[in-house]
Amino acid sequence: MIYRENFGSLILPLLLSALVGYLLGSISFAILLTKAFAHEDVRAHGSGNAGATNVLRVAGKKASALTFLLDFCKCVASVLVGYFLVKHACVANGVDPEMARLGMYAAGFCCMIGHMYPLYFGFRGGKGVVTTAAMMLLLDWRVFLICFAVFLLVFLKKRMVSLSSITAAAIYPVVTFCMTYFVDCCVGGLPVLYVVMATLVAALIGATVIIKHRANIKRIRNGTESTISFKKK
């Protein structure tokens, strides 16, 4: 159980977790690798997005695969740093160690924001799909697997990463609620507060990803959105 007088001890590590997450998220591997492989700014080509999909269009499969891997890893690093920073504070101040998950949420979400609005690259980044996927996996692998399955089904049908990402983001809070309430709460005995917190964060993450895809949504409606081809360049 966490007491009011102890909660203040988590504020600083939570803020530090958020800062670390944002700074790590601001490292845009899409921009760095496209410059290294193709000597171009990925944001000046294709969709204008600094993400693995656009890197595939501009710099090829190797650069895209590396971008995907490194974007995933930076979110993993952020979430782990956030978890251990807050867990250390919990142990030192007699707070329930389960509250360390707050550090994961803070660092992971801010890593996603850093990826979208990178400090080092004029606040023009990607749409946060890979970083969001990494955070989903670390926070709840069950929810991740369901959302990823939906992502794959939509992608195999439409060949549009944007539509697949939007669909997965839209169902993310719904799947999170169902899993945390019907499994973790009703069966596992976790408090309703945990369900509320997890669902609210999932809704915030999903909404952020969808908002970042506004231009893609317009192109999908107009039938002009780009599709992915696996033919050799």
Segments from the language model and where they lie:
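Short, strongly hydrophobic alpha-helical membrane anchors
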Residues: 1-12
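Membrane-interface helix termini and inter-helical loops of multi-pass transporters
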Residues: 2-4, 90-94, 181-193
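Alpha-helical transmembrane segments in multi-pass membrane proteins
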Residues: 13, 17, 21-26, 30, ...
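Cytosolic, membrane-interface loops and tails of multi-pass inner-membrane proteins
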Residues: 31-64, 125, 218-233
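Short, non-helical or kinked segments that cap or interrupt transmembrane helices
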Residues: 40-52, 120-133, 160-171
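Interfacial segments of multi-pass membrane proteins
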Residues: 56-60, 82-86, 128-158, 171-180
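C-terminal membrane-associated helical module and adjoining short loops/tails
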Residues: 190-233
